[in-house]
A protein has these predicted regions:
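Leucine-rich repeat
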Residues: 1-383
Length: 383
């Protein structure tokens, strides 16, 4: 094969034996000539390799619609799509690096760009904001599911002078927000306050940087009339302003006992209620003198901080939940048997409960058997 290439007219060269060369100058000329020949052969080889690779590309073998489905499946399976993952979404950019055909397809496939997790660095925030702007343009006009978190230690963002470039970019597309999951720097609250309706936003998750309690007024989502699900932590309920009757699912961590009861009272259409890391009673809201009924809650989870087991019982004693099907309670190990309080809630509610989970406190096997026999609708107890 090499002999054939060397004999080709485009590679004509007269190869000499070393014995035919007499002087050092002639030897140097021969070496240069051979170097040039090898370079030309390498270049030609690279051309043939590119041609071979191009012909073997998936983009030349499959229709664009099928390749697009493969891209979307790869994105759905990527680690960045796992909730609470620390991995940023980079797959669309990686696909664009393979070849121009893949890049052209990926850049036009808006579904690749409408759901993402962006990890922000304080030092690179302006540059990341420009890249985010380009990213969002590629999503065309699709509804956006956005998650933002920080590469830096969150304490570095916990001041009013933190960059707001990213928020300014997001605000230009607020009419397309479908789901937002944000860690809020103190400087971000004010830019988010814009008097425009958020007609597409249905899911919202917010917590302050460094999990430090925020006293800032949170009214920037009051015009989100389609909001159905919200997750909050380290905010005071008195500062949170939402269309409470629209909510069907809420997760609130670090609420005080009276905030938790008030929250349930406000959300008349709540179906799923998750209350984690309860704090002691803060006397912000008065507890009801008698239990009140919430007729829609079907799934109820409640968990307390260490040594605050009585707070859970206080909340349960305030409620009647006639639609309750699934109850989950997280308790410290040293707490007394909670089954009596739970039984009173079930009796008072006359609910069709089917599943009970009690974690943190170990129940006696006979107690669980007796409880299952006494509550006819109950199908399982997990402990």
């Amino acid at each position: 094969m090499v002999k054939k290439v060397l004999e080709d007219a485009s590679y004509q060269v007269q190869l000499k034996n070393p014995s035919e060369v007499q002087t050092p100058e002639q030897i140097d000329l021969e070496i240069v000539a051979l170097d040039n020949l090898m370079l030309r052969i390498q270049n030609r080889r690279a051309e043939f390799c590119r041609a071979r690779n191009q012909s073997a590309l998936i983009s030349s073998c499959l229709p664009a619609e099928l390749i697009a489905e493969i891209f979307l499946f790869a994105l759905a399976m990527s680690p960045s799509q796992v909730p609470s993952s620390s991995v940023a979404t980079t797959l669309p950019l990686v696909l664009g690096q393979v070849c121009s055909a893949w890049r052209n397809l990926a850049w036009e496939l808006s579904e690749l760009w409408d759901t993402f997790h962006c990890r922000i660095s304080k030092g690179r925030c302006p540059a990341q904001a420009r890249l985010l702007s380009e990213w969002l343009l590629r999503s065309h006009e699709r509804p956006l599911s956005i998650r933002l978190s920080f590469l830096d230690d969150e304490f570095h963002w916990n001041d009013l002078g933190a960059p707001i470039d990213i928020v300014n970019v997001l605000n230009r597309h607020r009419h397309r927000w479908l789901a937002l999951d944000l860690v809020l720097a103190p400087s971000w609250y004010e830019p988010l306050r814009m008097e425009t309706t958020l007609d597409t936003l249905i899911s919202l998750s917010l917590r302050p940087t460094a999990s430090a309690f925020s006293a800032q007024r949170m009214d920037m989502f009051l015009l989100a009339h389609q909001l159905r699900e919200i997750s909050l932590s380290h905010h005071y309920l008195r500062n949170v302003h939402l269309n409470w009757d629209n909510l069907i699912k809420i997760s609130f961590s670090t609420a005080s006992v009276d905030e938790a009861v008030e929250l349930i009272r406000r959300c008349n259409n709540l179906v799923t209620c998750i209350l984690d890391e309860l704090y002691p009673f803060e006397d912000e809201y008065a507890l009801p003198l008698t239990p009140f009924s919430h007729r829609r809650i079907e799934v109820f989870h409640i968990g307390c901080r260490v040594n605050l087991d009585t707070e859970i019982f206080i909340i349960l004693n305030c409620l009647a939940l006639p639609s309750l099907r699934n109850l989950s309670i997280m308790l410290p190990e040293q707490v007394g048997n909670p089954l009596q309080t739970i039984g009173e809630l079930i009796t008072r509610s006359e609910c069709p409960i089917q599943k009970l989970r009690i974690h943190g406190h170990t129940l006696l096997e006979q107690d669980m058997i007796d409880f299952l026999q006494s509550v006819k609708s109950l199908k399982s107890i997990e402990n």
